[in-house]
């Protein structure tokens, strides 16, 4: 990301990717989304398929999926650039690009056997999606100890019993990856991951009523049988199998919140430049100028932290701490920026003809998802206090 002069900028191919997604969002996605109800969670099947075809035609399909499996195979830095731009729509907090770019299967699925990849291949082909089930009613931030869902080995299969909670996308998905405890171990070594097929008996869903534009589920397993060939990795090694994937999900997650906040700031700047109060433009008032300036400072800093984490990952470095730093600062800064933007708009800031109040609600959850800020602060502090200093 540095050229011979020592200046810092994105590689040319990623600038081109950013500009292509930005144009696609403005020219293709926004006109479709503008016709939807304010709190719509998904597009209807026909307009979604039409958008997905257009995205495929310009090479913007399943951006995280490796090229050999039909996706764009972006680096983690590329995924962050794409995530920021694809989030700049009303439903961007949970459905990037309104689903136009497909729904990448969990990357960990590609580490499985060809048989285990069957559902992931269908998702890439058909634009459908999967779910990942880790959190439980007993806890989510410490899954190694809180997972109570059990998988009991019986001959050539496992029988799963238990409940998962806060599972995004489970209602739309045909399959998922579930983490369950096998054997007597109480810690991470007892966790195994499995491919689960929603069409088989023994699995049921119940929707959790939360904010209007978000639809998580409880996923219940009642003597659900999984053949041994659908166990991902070795028994008791579920987290070891997926740990890198879970860590690498954090920079793009933070990047998406930055994209939403940037879109909010762009709206606020445009509003301040034309709205008058007390005889002059809002943009001429120091209070407004400082809110805009503070927002710009925070977004630039957050973006660079995300890019640093992704860049280090692409170089093969351990980014456990970098990812936590980017996730904490990115999600919290994004929330502060949208809060300021609502203040700049005044009463219009919570009007449903604008996306600001929806973004405000949804960004609040982002400080909890993918690990709450407090847990990531623990990760950062332990690194600093250990004397090993894995981070930068």
Language model region names:
Residues 139-143, 158:
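Hydrophobic, small-residue-rich alpha-helical packing segments that form membrane-like cores
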Residues 148, 156-157, 161-204:
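A short core secondary-structure module
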Residues 146-147, 199-225:
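Flexible, small-/acidic-enriched active-site or ligand-binding loops
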Residues 140, 165-171, 211, 248-252, ...:
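Glycine-rich phosphate/pyrophosphate-binding beta-alpha loops
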């Amino acid at each position: 990301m540095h050229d011979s002069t020592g200046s810092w900028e994105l590689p040319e191919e990623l600038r081109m990717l950013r500009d292509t997604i930005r144009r696609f969002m403005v020219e293709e996605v926004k006109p479709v989304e503008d016709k939807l109800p304010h709190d719509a969670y998904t597009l209807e099947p026909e307009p979604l398929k039409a958008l997905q075809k257009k995205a495929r035609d310009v090479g913007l399909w399943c951006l995280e999926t490796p090229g050999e499996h039909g996706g764009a195979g972006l680096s983690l830095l590329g995924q962050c650039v794409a995530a920021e731009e694809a989030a700049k729509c009303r439903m961007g907090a949970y459905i990037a690009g309104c689903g136009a770019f497909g729904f990448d299967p969990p990357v960990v699925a590609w580490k499985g056997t060809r048989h285990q990849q069957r559902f992931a291949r269908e998702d890439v082909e058909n634009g459908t999606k999967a779910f990942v089930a880790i959190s439980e009613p007993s806890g989510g931030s410490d899954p190694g100890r809180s997972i109570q869902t059990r998988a009991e080995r019986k001959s050539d299969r496992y029988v799963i019993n238990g409940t998962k909670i806060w599972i995004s996308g489970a209602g739309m998905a045909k399959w998922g990856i579930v983490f369950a405890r096998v054997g007597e171990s109480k810690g991470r070594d007892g966790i195994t991951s499995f491919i689960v097929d929603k069409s088989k008996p023994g699995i049921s869903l119940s929707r959790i009523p939360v904010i209007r534009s978000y639809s998580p589920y409880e996923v219940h397993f009642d003597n659900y049988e999984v053949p041994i060939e659908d166990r991902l990795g070795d028994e008791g090694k579920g987290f070891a199998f997926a740990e890198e994937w879970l860590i690498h999900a954090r920079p793009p997650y933070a990047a998406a919140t930055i994209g939403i906040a940037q879109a909010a700031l762009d709206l606020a700047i445009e509003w301040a430049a034309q709205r008058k109060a007390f005889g002059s433009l809002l943009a001429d008032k120091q209070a407004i100028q400082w809110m805009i300036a503070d927002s710009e400072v925070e977004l630039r800093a957050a973006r660079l932290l995300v890019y640093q984490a992704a860049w280090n990952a692409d170089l093969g470095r351990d980014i456990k701490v970098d990812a936590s730093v980017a996730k904490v600062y990115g999600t919290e800064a994004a929330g502060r920026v949208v809060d300021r933007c609502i203040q700049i708009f005044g009463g219009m800031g919570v009007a449903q003809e604008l996306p600001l109040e929806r973004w405000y609600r949804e960004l609040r959850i982002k400080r909890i998802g993918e690990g709450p800020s407090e847990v990531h602060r623990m990760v950062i502090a332990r690194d600093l206090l250990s004397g090993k200093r894995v981070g930068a």
